[in-house]
């Protein structure tokens, strides 16, 4: 609205940051924070792709953590203000940090609020991670998925 564009992608990143004081007056702080997430996440995705192409999984994990932290802080999509006593996503993310101890990484995934946690867990602690999460959130709360060696591809 502030820039007269239909979508944020049409706004220059530097122009956005320069105009934050005025944008805050027009759109409020939450809109500013969400836009900041979008601008930084757009760059971060490119870095994630590069890290995977270079087979640098440690860098990829750092970027996933940064992305998840940004979702939590700037998108504010981990809990609902309508029921602050229920913050399952935040609890799950905090527990993931405790369980993984830097060996893996987790982040909010999907739409948040009633979304899911995406966790990259080393094979040798998958069972421990799953048990701990299900001890807290209930049976079948944690689903173990595997990524194929070849990733996504078109099937004819």
List each model region and its residues.
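C-terminal nucleotide
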Residues: 1-107, 119-156
């Amino acid at each position: 609205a502030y820039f007269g564009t239909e979508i944020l992608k049409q706004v220059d990143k530097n122009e956005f940051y320069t105009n934050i004081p005025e944008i805050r007056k027009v759109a409020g702080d939450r809109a500013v924070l969400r836009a900041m997430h979008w601008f930084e996440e757009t760059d971060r995705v490119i870095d994630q792709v590069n890290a995977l192409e270079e087979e640098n999984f440690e860098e990829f994990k750092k970027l996933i953590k940064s992305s998840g932290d940004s979702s939590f802080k700037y998108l504010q999509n981990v809990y609902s203000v309508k029921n602050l006593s229920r913050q399952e996503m935040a609890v799950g993310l905090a527990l993931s940090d405790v369980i993984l101890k830097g060996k893996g990484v987790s982040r909010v995934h999907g739409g948040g609020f009633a979304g899911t946690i995406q966790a990259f867990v080393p094979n040798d602690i998958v069972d421990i991670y799953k048990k701990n999460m299900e001890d807290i959130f209930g049976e079948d709360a944690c689903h173990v998925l595997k990524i194929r060696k070849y990733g996504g591809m078109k099937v004819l």
